[in-house]
């Protein structure tokens, strides 16, 4: 690596200093420095050492409370709790989604989403197991207890929490 001595372009600097500015320079204000407002961490209050005149320039006050408006948008991940899936196996190969839905509905009163039957990608044939999504893990445990001992076409239904 080569080290080159720095020589400023003094001639160019002097030439630029001689340029006369256009417009009324008296109306231009130059702010030397500004300081950002300080916030206390983990609170919603502005720092104690902030002066009263600085508080008026604070763009917003951080808030940890929920919005006061009841129709405020809440993302779906925050709105509903973590869902849980149950794997239903040992199902007959001629099973349909509607039939499985009616069988589960007849044995439990827990709300569940429509069952997803797992199909073979190449042939499109049912593979013998399905997944049911529920609102919580407690509902999943209740569904497993309710479906214990259920037989479909002389096949014992097996239910377990999906991994």
UniProtKB/Swiss-Prot annotation:
Range of residues in the leader sequence: none
A GO molecular-function annotation: RNA binding
What are the record keywords, sorted? RNA-binding
Indicate whether Oxidoreductase appears among the record's keywords: no
Q: Does the keyword tRNA processing apply?
A: no
Domain RRM: residue ranges = 84-163
In terms of superkingdom, the source organism counts as Eukaryota
What Pfam families does the record tag this protein with? RRM_1
Which InterPro entries would you find in this protein's record? Nucleotide-bd_a/b_plait_sf, RBD_domain_sf, RRM_dom
- PROSITE patterns in UniProt: RRM
Tell me the protein's name: RRM-domain-containing protein ECU01_0840
